[in-house]
Curated annotation (Swiss-Prot):
GTP 1 binds at residues 9-16, 56-60, 118-121. The keyword GTP-binding applies. The keyword Nucleotide-binding applies. Keywords: GTP-binding, Nucleotide-binding, Repeat, Ribosome biogenesis. Residues 168-191 are annotated as: Disordered. The gene is der. This is GTPase Der. Residues 172-189 have a biased composition (Acidic residues). It comes from Shewanella sediminis (strain HAW-EB3). Associates with the 50S ribosomal subunit. Gene3D superfamilies: 3.30.300.20, P-loop containing nucleotide triphosphate hydrolases (3.40.50.300). It comes from the Bacteria. InterPro entries: G_ENGA, GTP-bd, GTPase_Der, KH_dom-like, KH_dom-like_a/b, P-loop_NTPase, Small_GTP-bd. GTP 2 binds at residues 206-213, 253-257, 318-321.
């Protein structure tokens, strides 16, 4: 399960700056996900081989009343969900009463906490950070989030003790090399067999009261999950193993994600974290949309998170029974207009309550998983690359034509194609999209996003120790050149 890192601290200590750097966004507001409280932001981060969810819990004012209300209502539940807590302080401002009050709450939670002294640029960092040792939470780590100094080392140190338990790769470079290396036929076949033998993890996500638990019960044929006509019945993600048509599955019924203004209870506010972790943990996402309400911003937010995670996708429009034909036409038109960018995903119109169309969902889930784990040979990928070049030549870069040499599989679930060549990293985004769509059409990939990575081929002579000619060698070279000229 992907770990959660919570950023805790008083206002203006640099939490949003660190959040933006970890999530590689320019504005923390772009990660202000529907369903979270106003002061909480989340994002998906990948740094130095570690993949994790980072949560900014918002500033805490430090007053007794503020600590009791803000910490209890917004931050304590987030800290409970977190695997690691980064307690940010301001090295320039020094230790304050607010820092000490927050420290007391963190100590009572008995969570793994790292004290981070931010804004150490331009000052005597060791002297400025000395007083933070009085907090009694262990070593004080120095960081300048705005410049990125110390960020990578901090994350590596914070997550390294849990790397094995959380299934993380300690060395990011090794992970990248493994991901982009060319599989041999035996290795590719073994990897595909391993994936095919594993149960398919299918996460059912969507807004509250769209019928996720009803669909789960319909599939299982039993009242396994509590169903009630009220949003927020499911508070946690429920993992349910099952078998269908000789294939093993693990269904994940997740809590719904609502608009922030409609989220009042603390326990519900943070159930969204479990939903996001379930998306990271699954193989196929089944997004449920309410036909009566149409596509909401929460649906698009969940859809974006699933795509960013590279998960295979199936969409089910629920409550399709009992609505007028003109409403059905309007919903289909809206789906075409707003979901045109995911034309690879199958869309089903179902009634979870009555079972209409539910049986066909598994056909699309199986198809999406097969596409995500399908093995394609290097020769086939290279041949498709050559066909794409013939149809549309790469553009000129610095007066030279970009040359694509060969392609190979770089990974599964989602399928990754690595294209090697000269100056390929300088290709414009438009040509990269052309290549991605060309591979999708040629391979007939359905139900899963496909990733195209471009790798510049290494110069075989780069770094070679070219020795300077000796005096005798230089004279001999001149005699040979003179002899060649005389012959002409």
């Amino acid at each position: 399960m992907i770990p959660v890192v919570a950023l805790v601290g008083r206002p203006n200590v640099g939490k949003s700056t660190l959040f933006n750097r970890l999530t590689r966004t320019r504005d923390a507001l772009v990660a202000d996900f529907p369903g979270l409280t106003r002061d909480r932001k989340y994002g998906r981060a990948f740094l130095s081989g570690y993949e994790f969810i980072v949560v900014d819990t918002g500033g805490i004012d430090g007053t007794e009343e503020g600590i009791e209300t803000h910490m209890a209502e917004q931050s304590l539940a987030a800290i409970e969900e977190a695997d690691v807590v980064l307690f940010l302080t301001d090295a320039r401002a020094g230790l304050t009463a607010a820092d000490q009050a927050i420290c007391e709450h963190l100590r009572r939670r008995e969570k793994t906490t790292f004290v981070v002294a931010n804004k150490v640029d331009g000052i005597d960092a060791d002297s400025a950070c000395a007083e933070f040792w009085a907090l009694g939470l262990g070593e004080v780590y120095q960081m300048a989030a705005a410049q990125g100094r110390g960020v990578t080392n901090m994350i590596e140190y914070a997550l390294a003790p849990y790397a094995e338990a959380l299934g993380l790769n300690r060395d990011g470079d090794e992970d990248e090399d493994e991901e982009e290396r060319e599989y041999s036929e035996e290795e590719a076949e073994a990897e595909q067999k391993r994936l095919q033998d594993l149960p398919i993890k299918m996460a059912i996500i969507g807004k509250p009261n769209v019928g996720k638990s009803t669909l789960t019960n319909r599939i299982l044929g039993e009242e396994r999950v509590v169903v009630y006509d009220s949003p927020g019945t499911t508070r946690d993600s429920i993992y349910i193993p099952m078998e269908r048509d000789g294939r093993e599955y693990v269904m994940i019924d997740t809590a719904g994600v609502r608009r922030r203004s409609k989220v009042h209870e603390t326990v519900e506010k943070f159930s969204v974290i479990k939903t996001l972790k379930a998306v990271e943990d699954c193989n196929v996402v089944l997004l449920i949309i309410d036909a009566r309400e149409g596509i909401a911003e929460q649906d698009l937010g969940l859809l974006g998170f699933a795509l960013n995670a590279g998960r295979a996708l199936v969409i089910a429009v629920n409550k399709w029974d009992g609505i007028d034909q003109d409403i059905k036409d309007r919903v289909k038109s809206e789906l075409d207009r707003r979901l045109g960018f995911i034309d690879f995903a199958r869309i089903h119109f179902i009634s979870a309550l009555h079972g209409t169309g539910v049986g066909h969902l598994f056909e699309s889930v199986q198809e999406a998983y097969d596409s995500a784990t399908r093995r394609v040979s290097t020769s086939m990928l290279t041949r498709i690359m050559q066909m794409a070049q013939d149809d549309h030549q790469p553009p000129l870069v610095n007066g030279r034509r970009v040359k694509l040499k060969y392609a190979h599989a770089g990974g599964y679930n989602p399928p990754i194609v690595v294209v090697h060549g000269n100056q390929v990293k300088k290709l414009p985004d438009s040509y990269k999209r052309f290549m991605m769509n060309y591979y999708r059409r040629s391979l007939k990939v359905m139900g899963t996003p496909i990733q195209i990575r471009f790798q510049d081929s290494a110069n075989p002579f780069e770094g070679m120790n070219t020795k300077k000619l000796t005096v005798s060698q230089e004279r001999r070279r001149k005699r040979m050149m003179t002899h060649i000229k005389d012959k002409k």
